[in-house]
Swiss-Prot record:
Its EC number is 3.6.4.-. InterPro entries: AAA+_ATPase, AAA_lid_4, DNA_helicase_Holl-junc_RuvB, P-loop_NTPase, RuvB-like_N, RuvB_C, WH-like_DNA-bd_sf, WH_DNA-bd_sf. Belongs to the RuvB family. This is Holliday junction branch migration complex subunit RuvB.
Length: 340
């Protein structure tokens, strides 16, 4: 995937990060889509505010780019509390976590992205903090080492993961609120593109907004990234506004087709067809064949390809569908058994 459009890419330059934050909704009213999740969260937040309690620990899971981080920030805003943000891979030692927990004020939100990547020792350390709002820390070392219990202010842990199946059962059980975010339809993404273009003060036609939305893989983060790139083309190659012609020109230049598939998506499909006769093929073998990590294929590319019906998982591996053959203009070879 073009790194400018990759929903997992964390290597944006400072200007891109600022723009991404600028486009993020700050309240429930500004957030588009995920209606059932949103309605439930509104009730949970109102009830917590009414009782003056910390919101129950909350887990958001689903493909990248659908709004998990945005919703964590919205929860803090709607609760009227502070938020501290970190990620699973960053928390190497219990001491890293202790520093965050002891600096939380009452009812604050601690957001841990990629929570499935917490180390086992840090995860176990988190259990007592989540359940009892207490942690035990070791003072000194050697024969003088002793454990001291520290009381924490009641807080809300918000976890986000793209791979909920990797969460341990004890960790999952400690989240009182669990919400799965779904891919967006084109209509909702069109609304998001129009809202973002308004914030960016970039005029856009309805046709162009629909075109960008239709190629955004059902993902708001990709829709906003595409909009920013199309805006670049509009300012340099166009007349400073986004119409259907400049939108198509820009998206084609970015190698994003009408289905939202990019070079790597099509490479995956072509590889399964050309090298493995349509499949089945194992994930690690496929990853080697396309020079991409298994994790990236499984987290970034595969969910959308399955959602859109281009590939399917079977007990023996990945297989392409008839839709993939039609999309690529290929004819499925007839494979017959027997000796003759």
């Amino acid at each position: 995937m073009n790194e400018n459009l990759d929903p997992t890419n964390q290597k944006y330059n400072p200007e891109e990060l600022d723009l991404e934050k600028k486009l993020r909704p700050l309240s429930f009213d500004d957030f588009t889509g995920q209606e059932q999740v949103l309605e439930n969260l509104k009730i949970f937040v109102q009830a917590a505010n009414l009782r003056g309690e910390a919101l129950d620990h909350t887990l958001f899971h689903g493909p990248p780019g659908l709004g998990k981080t945005t919703l964590a920030n919205i929860l803090a805003n709607e609760l009227g509390v502070g938020i501290k943000i970190t990620s699973g891979p960053v928390l190497d030692k219990p001491g890293d976590l202790a520093g965050l927990l002891t600096n939380l004020d009452e009812r604050d939100v601690l957001f841990i992205d990629e929570i499935h990547r917490l180390s086992p020792i840090v995860e176990e350390y988190l259990y007592s903090a989540m359940e009892d709002f207490k942690i035990d820390i070791m003072i000194e070392s050697g024969p003088n080492a002793r454990s001291v219990q520290i009381n924490l202010s009641p807080f809300t842990l918000v976890g986000a993961t793209t791979r909920s199946g990797l969460l341990t059962a004890p960790m999952r059980a400690r989240f009182g609120i669990q919400s799965r975010l779904q891919y967006y339809n084109a209509e909702l993404l069109t609304t998001i593109v129009q809202r973002s273009s308004s914030i960016l003060k970039m005029p856009i036609t309805m046709e162009a907004a629909i075109e960008i939305a239709g190629r955004s893989r059902g993902t708001p983060r990709i829709a906003n990234a595409m909009l920013r790139r199309v805006r670049d083309f509009a300012q340099i190659k166009g007349n400073g506004s986004i119409d259907i012609e400049i939108a198509k020109f820009a998206l084609n230049a970015l190698h994003v087709d009408a289905h939202g598939l990019d070079e790597m998506d099509n490479k995956i499909l072509n590889t399964i067809i050309d090298k493995f006769k349509g499949g089945p093929v194992g994930l690690s073998t496929l990853a080697t064949a396309v020079s991409e990590s298994s994790e990236t294929i499984e987290e970034v590319y595969e969910p959308f390809l399955i959602q859109e019906g281009f590939i399917m998982r079977t007990p023996r591996g990945r297989e392409v569908t008839e839709k993939a053959y039609k999309h690529l203009g290929k004819v499925k070879a007839n494979v017959q058994g027997g000796l003759f």
